[in-house]
Amino acid sequence: MYLSRAVSPRNVPVFSTGSFALDVALGVGGLPKGRLVEIYGPEASGKTALALHMLSMLLIRSLAKAIGVNTENLLLSQPDCGKQALSLVDTLIQSGSVDVIVVDSVAALVPKGELDGEMGDAHMAIQARLMSQALRKFSHSLLLSQTLLIFINQVRERFGGPTEVTSGGNALKFYAPMRLDIKRIGLIKKGEEFFRMTKCLCLNACAHNGKSSLREDSEEQARSAI
């Protein structure tokens, strides 16, 4: 079989982020269904707010409420450890009954061995191995269920290397076809209220499966204020 016949460009169905400017900047109209997306950035940069705003678009289209999250249709879970959380995510994906899953956050996915150990014990790369195993399993299930899986992640400083790195090892960078770097760039005052202005940088927008593009033309880095 020729490669040109086996792999054909196609538009991937998406979920809107709730921001028209960001949807346009992403190049595909939103966050792709059946894929894994990472939203990361420093604290108080708007990562969780973006995820909640997108959920509000799915739960109530009219956006009658200020934030719009319909708590009657929103499942909230607070697992005891990282393995339990990722096992729950796997169950939800395979059920095919959930459109969007948000994991907030990667840094909070503490391995059980670390919870059971003593303070000061060395637990090198346990979380990275846990994430790597889970993402290998998720990648195929997401395509079958067309569920969107969003991981919210923090950045931290690392000595002797890049100024900022994300938690959870390198597996998330490899498996996520779209990574959104969120940064706060200022505040806007309207009357007595302050609103956060955020800049979003889309780092890569190619599907992991075969490294194919999410749309026909190649995706450039996109910036958008949300």
Curated annotation (Swiss-Prot):
InterPro entries: AAA+_ATPase, DNA_recomb/repair_RecA, P-loop_NTPase, RecA-like_N, RecA_ATP-bd, RecA_monomer-monomer_interface. The keyword DNA damage applies. GO terms for molecular function: ATP binding; ATP hydrolysis activity; ATP-dependent DNA damage sensor activity; single-stranded DNA binding. Signal peptide: none annotated. Involved in recombination ability and DNA strand transfer activity. ATP binds at residues 41-48. GO terms for cellular component: cytoplasm. SMART domains: AAA (SM00382). It holds the Pfam family RecA. Keywords: ATP-binding, Cytoplasm, DNA damage, DNA recombination, DNA-binding, Nucleotide-binding. This is Putative DNA repair protein recA homolog 4. Its main location: cytoplasm. The keyword DNA-binding applies. Belongs to the RecA family. GO terms for biological process: DNA recombination; DNA repair. It is found in: Cytoplasm.
